[in-house]
Amino acid sequence: MNHSRSHALFAQAQTVLPGGVNSPVRAFKSVGGEPFFVARADGSYLFDVDGNRYIDYVGSWGPMIAGHNHPAVREAVERAIRDGLSFGAPCAAEVTMAETITGLVPSCEMVRMVNSGTEATLSAVRLARGATGRNRIIKFEGCYHGHGDSFLVKAGSGMLTLGVPTSPGVPAGLSELTATLSFNDFEGATALFDEIGPEVAAVIIEPVVGNANCIPPQAGYLQHLRTLCTRHGALLIFDEVMTGFRVALGGAQAHYGVTPDLSTFGKIIGGGMPVGAYGGRRDLMEQIAPAGPIYQAGTLSGNPVAMAAGLAMLELVQEPGFHMRLSEATSALCEGLKDAARTAGIAVTTNQVGGMFGLFFTDDIVESYAQATACDITSFNRFFHAMLQRGVYLAPSAYEAGFMSSAHDATVIEATLAAARDAFADVAR
């Protein structure tokens, strides 16, 4: 493939954008090489500035569940922009969006719109601290909740040690308020609550880890956290920015049958536009200003164009059988990838929940961040580039989930698997 225009653009971008990008993973640092620059997208495909076409399994990191540039979403945006781009005042679409979310996610009795997933998680944690009068939070290895200071923390040597910052600029005093656990560790969660339970405002978790590739919860794990939070008076926050409306119509909480106190959303509810939301029990949400004393605001929150796009997308995912078909297509892809790897003599396993999937270069079932980081990253990187050269775009990191859309039909999946058979053969050489 020719990437001359992308190469020139990346060189130009590095003179005016830190690292040449506006989000680190886009720079291909994890896999090596240089990123391609996208000119347009349609259905299951991306087209770069050099005219190359790629089958896309990133889907803008999750929101494009019905495929890129879906006519219903595009037309909703076109209608909305005729009336204006931003009002800074209430509009009918934000009420409809809130009613839609509360109708689909029973744990959310009220919703507040924001502008990003990061903003949603930051706001939910502030609400949890304000509502409980406590300051500490618990998060999990491999779970990403945006770039807020409280979330850029990893565990020290042992589960009960204080958190230490993973980014310069995060005050140590703030990071000490975040404790980190291993995902799917039942005993560790119990022990940590026994140690610091009265200080914990909230547990925040990706119910399916999507930022350490794709790691589902073990049976009963989310319910175990629900029980611990209830017992110790802490709130349970599900970060459903990735999983919301993707793994099931009601999100991971519906899929696993566990009810959080607060939930955060993004991606799909904007149909590709910048958006976020958090919601939960009425008694909690009514503590947010102006109804209550816990402050949170945003100039562009409830933006009418983003609301129009999101409402159109949510109509699409409510079509009968949508999630069943999406899950079946994702399963077909995963089984085909494993078969192709097996034929090439390469150890590969997959995880899948609904329209999310993960590809791991290992024989082991991956159920933790430690297992994910122990996989053969070098082979993944070689496979990534071999697929890219064959016109298939996977997430440019071994630690990111893949995303299926309803536009990935049987023909697209077979083309992907044909490329994978050749790519695995390259890796095996």
Swiss-Prot record:
A Pfam family: Aminotran_3
Gene Ontology BP, a term: protoporphyrinogen IX biosynthetic process
Quaternary context: Homodimer.
GO cellular component: cytoplasm
PANTHER family: GLUTAMATE-1-SEMIALDEHYDE 2,1-AMINOMUTASE, GLUTAMATE-1-SEMIALDEHYDE 2,1-AMINOMUTASE 1, CHLOROPLASTIC-RELATED
Main localization (coarse): cytoplasm
Enzyme Commission number: 5.4.3.8
Keyword Isomerase on entry: yes
Cofactor(s) the record lists: pyridoxal 5'-phosphate
Single GO MF descriptor: glutamate-1-semialdehyde 2,1-aminomutase activity
Localisation: Cytoplasm
Pathway terms, separated by semicolons: Porphyrin-containing compound metabolism; protoporphyrin-IX biosynthesis; 5-aminolevulinate from L-glutamyl-tRNA(Glu): step 2/2
Keyword list, A-Z: Cytoplasm, Isomerase, Porphyrin biosynthesis, Pyridoxal phosphate
Family membership: Belongs to the class-III pyridoxal-phosphate-dependent aminotransferase family. HemL subfamily.
Catalytic reaction list: (S)-4-amino-5-oxopentanoate = 5-aminolevulinate
UniProt-recorded name of the protein: Glutamate-1-semialdehyde 2,1-aminomutase
